[in-house]
Amino acid sequence: MPTITLPDGSQRSFDHSVSVAEVAASIGAGLAKATVAGKVDGKLVDASDLITNDASLQIITPKDQEGLEIIRHSCAHLIGHAVKQLYPTAKMVIGPVIDEGFYYDIAYERPFTPDDMAAIEQRMHALIEKDYDVIKKVTPRAEVIDVFTARGEDYKLRLVEDMPDEQAMGLYYHEEYVDMCRGPHVPNTRFLKSFKLTKLSGAYWRGDAKNEQLQRIYGTAWADKKQLAAYIQRIEEAEKRDHRKIGKRLNLFHLQEEAPGMVFWHPNGWTLYQVLEQYMRKVQRENGYLEIKTPQVVDRSLWEKSGHWANYADNMFTTQSENRDYAIKPMNCPCHVQVFNQGLKSYRELPMRLAEFGACHRNEPSGALHGIMRVRGFTQDDAHIFCTEEQMQAESAAFIKLTMDVYRDFGFTEVEMKLSTRPEKRVGSDELWDRAEAALAAALDSAGLAYDLQPGEGAFYGPKIEFSLKDCLGRVWQCGTLQLDFNLPIRLGAEYVSEDNSRKHPVMLHRAILGSFERFVGILIEHYEGAFPAWLAPTQAVIMNITDKQADFAAEVEKTLNESGFRAKSDLRNEKIGFKIREHTLLKVPYLLVIGDREVEMQTVAVRTREGADLGSMPVAQFAEFLAQAVSRRGRPDSE
């Protein structure tokens, strides 16, 4: 009979096979009521599952991350229950958990509307109020097929076909509704009260645009109403910061159907973009990078040699000319190897750091495009470091330091790092992987940085570090990458003459800090809600006159500031000064300079910030010095 060992080391013995729920009840009524599932010897199981042998057990409640994910998964099944009651001819497809929520894909004869979504949510709440138990039945394969055949659930039958080795499957019953899943799921609908459906979208069966289109209902679920309310507030704040809305309001860019996934930069947005590029150019030059420029359209033969044609062709834009196939480059690395290959290099010339603001194009599915965050045409702050094995650690450490400095300049102080190590299928010897992984780990350790280890998540050609920024809303954006590559230099014939006069292949470090410029601008827009630090603001100061009598001096101040290297504009319109101040405050201009008769007489400007602070009157030279200090701080706090 089983003896159950709990996380605190205490043990409970039973004279019969015992369910997770029974163990919880033996500990206390409160825990029994809160039990969502269990973890038996490290494996998640349903609360109703029996434990027949000695085992360790952790009771899973809504306070646990696993409990929250189970609640979300069960909410997806609840969508199915509600949809089948309201729209009996709908066909249910799949309903997985995603980050902070869930969705269900459904085939139906017409598009769902917001009114439909409201009706589905209302029905889900009504079902929850019935407080019914969710029943799990492990069912033989043939019976599963009979169940879904009788219900006309064609997609479920296709999913069963995808699992030929499964002789028994878990069926979960929500009253008359049944769904197929490995589980676990909540034992009762009382756990599902704190949910909300969030949006509708299209999807394709198996994610393939060639297949039939489905409808996707998204939702979120939390452990309690307080967590749900906090999430909704965060989402509302994120919507306020939507880079597409702010981009239009601040006249930064636009997108249009004739060029899907391609950005039309307006003067304000292009100014911001150029500030980023000029900053990165300066940083890279100061850190020993050599800037290059490579072609955008390259013959198929190079992509075949690099392996991209075989593995990436569906994502490449291609064209033909004079019976030759070409691809618009989706990435820069093969072209950078071509630059390295011009003339045999000596070990004395390594490391060689080649950088390019490389324009790339990828044929992303139209449904995946999102503003300037997910586009088809983009530019990367891309660079490749060609070095010896002995130089891997030093180059990695230097890059990590540079990356952290850059992020601080943009105002990001919380950075998450992941170190991904060797997968099962890989090139290169175990000894080489040992050295490469040790080099990246040592580089992170030497910088005093914490990181998450991702075993088996590296590319087949080398381990990597990913850098993810946390913005003001706590959202995480993966931006920087440091990827070691043992494969591409061999495939493309990159060699150098080593110290012993033999020829060796260099190690290639793919690296980016910002990633896509377009996406990084989108992140900045949302992080700052368009109120960029002075060094990034498209217009750093606007000069406004009160009456026409001050127009000449206002124009003179504008000229002085622009000649001093700042981005200043004057607003000489015949409008009330309050109107002008409000307009430029909404346009997020950092500094508003007001000129009246007194300022003309004293040769000063009255300075206000966009936040409404009155900095008083000061000579133009003093303001220029003040602005220069603000610009030099970049995005770092005043204390740094």
Curated annotation (Swiss-Prot):
| Residue numbers spanned by region Catalytic | 242-533
Cellular compartments per GO CC: cytosol
TGS domain location is 1-61
Biological process (GO) annotations held by this record are: threonyl-tRNA aminoacylation
Q: Which SMART domains match?
A: tRNA_SAD
- Its EC number is 6.1.1.3
The keyword Transferase is annotated on this UniProt entry:
no
What family does the entry list? Belongs to the class-II aminoacyl-tRNA synthetase family.
- This protein is called Threonine--tRNA ligase
Q: Which organism is it from?
A: Pseudomonas fluorescens (strain SBW25)
Q: What is the lineage of its organism?
A: Bacteria, Pseudomonadati, Pseudomonadota, Gammaproteobacteria, Pseudomonadales
Could you tell me the gene encoding this protein?
thrS
